[in-house]
Amino acid sequence: MNTITVVDARMGRGKSSAAIRYMNRYKDSKRFLYITPYLDEVGRICERCDFDQPDSDHMSKSTELKLHMRLGHNIAATHSLFYLMDTEALELVRQKHYSLIVDESIQVIERLNITNKDFDLIINQLATEHDDGRIEWLDDSYTGRFYDYKEMANTGSLFRLDSALLNILNPELLRSFDEVFMLTYLFDGQYQKAYLDFFGFDYNIIGVEQDESGYRFSDRPDAPPPLDYRELIRIVDDPKLNAVGDKHYALSKAWYDRRGYDNPEIRKLRNGLKKFFQSIPDGSSETRLWSCFKSDVNKLVDSRTGRFRNNFLQTSARATNQYKSRTDIAYMVNRFADPNIMKFFAKQNVTIDSEHFAKNFII
């Protein structure tokens, strides 16, 4: 089994630039699959490294990905396409000896939102469960409303844990590559680390260095020069504005789920958001940004005026410089690891650094 290289370095340290340098150096002797969350980054990699991307109008992207692999092309693609790689694609990865570079953390595990009735239907009629909890679909020709679940089952990623269904990245997706690089930050607070530990992957943690030719991967953990953020960040430590978040589980997903638009605490939070933005001298729509769970945005937007709706950014946003001009930030979230997911990892005594887990989302 290959050893995974984790490039753990903060934003702006040159991780993707180092990856581009590495791929351009070895692209004639190695074959690469570079995956990233965003299509514009796929285009940038194709331009900088002369890679191909699945973009045909005449076939599915997963089919085109396998076509490029059969031809031995270097490829850039999105995370979402990577998740759809099936056994045929993995066999091509092994045959052609591909290397994988993962830009930003991949979603290695998630709890699926499903009703009890639908859960029972899948478990009792549409699929069978293996001893390890893996779900296998019974009817390969099925095209009904649970087709997405069938696709997960076909890639070996659909699991049952008690009364929950989990989508867990098939570890063969990583094991099949000759080498794997993961470009990330705060690795020890991620599901990604817990996943590697759970499935017994060996990994090395390195950083990035700069020389006369640009950025390159180092052979040791990242050691950036210290930065003094005190002149760059002003925290508005107003007891009245922040009191709604004083309790340990305040602003968590479960906290929001138990409160509707007219709840006194939600109303207080909504008014606090308004007061915060109005208190910023010279603040405008171009400088404001606020975040909460996507499912709860309507609770914090005034139903009458709709004010600040256009300043919203969901907490799952990653790897973008699109909002670098925003200077007035309200982060209305308290992140905790999903207890069902932690129960799954606990079967192998795997834990996550809770402080770094929460910090991962805000950074």
Residue ranges of each PLM-predicted region?
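Conserved RecA-like ASCE P-loop NTPase motor core of nucleic-acid helicases/translocases
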Residues: 30-38, 180-184, 286-294
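Conserved motor-coupling elements within RecA-like helicase/translocase cores
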Residues: 61-75
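Short basic/glycine-enriched coil/helix segment immediately N-terminal to the Walker B
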Residues: 69-72, 86-98, 175, 284, ...
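Conserved RecA-like P-loop NTPase helicase motor core
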Residues: 80-86, 305-363
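SF2 helicase catalytic motif II
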Residues: 80-82, 90-157
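Interdomain hinge/linker at the junction between the two RecA-like core domains of SF2 helicases
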Residues: 190-191, 196-262, 272
